[in-house]
Each structure stands twice: as structure tokens, then as C-alpha cells.
Amino acid sequence: MLIKKLLANSSQEIDKIIETNLEKYLEILCKWNKTRNLVSRNLSKVELAEHIFDCICLMPFLNNKSIIDIGTGAGLPGIIISIMDENKEVVLVEPNQKKISFLLHIQAEMGLKNLVIKKEKFENVVLNSEGVLVARAFTEPNKFIEILEQKNIENSEIIMMVSEEIKIISPNWRVVYTASEAEKVLEKKRGFLNISRIEN
């Protein structure tokens, strides 16, 4: 009931069924992570629950129905978004076969019909320009901006989850930091970089 405890200390209100599904995801993630090192094998169950809670706190910022999670790894935040809002179409982009196997298992085990899984590098994937791009632990922010520039990204909403406040000055991109509620609850630096193209 680790996620329930974290939610109790926050303003996040979610359905009991969704809460149960998040706990189920945590259990499966813990089991697989011990042998497959999906996130970091050294992370405790409590720390994995904190990662999930961090993703829960992203939800109020996602108004679009289409979400593209870049380099999703073990499904953070994409799986969490899929569990919490069945009306959103969530695309997970991940090149690693080991992690793809886990994502497919989660999708089948939890019946996530709103999930699309793509085994591709972000640099090669064809994207829906109307979807919100989200990234967490994908790469460092300046490198991310470089990749966005190379791909000529047209998405109007891009959110990068970060563990520190980062200031980026770019001639083509506006980057604004927003603190996450997870920062207060976890007592760790947590926030989002809201990235948008500057119209010339």
C-alpha cells in the first residue's frame, strides 16, 4: 500500500480501482526489476513507488488525449498515464528489447487497450504532431533539445520530467521549469520542463 500512503499526503485524488492497478504495476515492476534491471536493480520497493508517484503528479498537466512517451524504459510515465486515464492514447517508444518484453507483459496482464508500444529509437520514430511528448530519464535536457531540433519536431506540447531546476537558453526553444507536487511529498527535487518552439 505504498502508493496509497504517498497519495494520502498529496492533493491527488484517484479512483480505488486505479489505485489498486498502480499497486499491481508496482508489484510486477519490483519482481521483474530484480532480474532484468529495468530501472535500477538497487532500487527498493519504496523508491520504485516514489518513481510511480512522481509520474502520478504529471497527470494534471496532460490535457491532450494523445501522449507519446519517449524512451519509456519500464513504462514511466507512460504506463502510469495509461492506467490512470483509459481515454488517453499512450504511445511508448523504447528501443531496448528487454524493456519491450516487460511493457508487452504489463499491457497483457493489465489489459491496457489504450497503449501502443513501439520498439524504435526516438530519432527514427514517426510521431503524431498533435500529441504531447513526455520524457523522463531519457537523456539530459540539452541533448534532448538537440534531438528535437534535428527531428524538426512540430508538437506544441513537450514535457520533460527532471530532478532539478535547469535553465536552458536556446534560440529556437522556450523552456520553463515548473515544480511538481512530488517535490513537497517526497522531499526531493522534482519538476517539469515545459518546452515549446519559439515562432520566428
Residue ranges and their predicted role:
Residues 70-72:
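Conserved beta-strand/loop positions that form the S-adenosyl-L-methionine
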Residues 63, 85, 153:
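Short conserved AdoMet
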Residues 56, 79, 142:
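Conserved active-site region of classical short-chain dehydrogenase/reductase
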Residues 29, 81, 195:
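Residue-level signal for inorganic ion chemistry
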Residues 1-64, 68, 98-115:
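Class I SAM-dependent transferase core
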Residues 88-91, 95-200:
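S-adenosylmethionine
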Residues 74-87:
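Conserved SAM-binding loop of SAM-dependent methyltransferases across substrates and taxa
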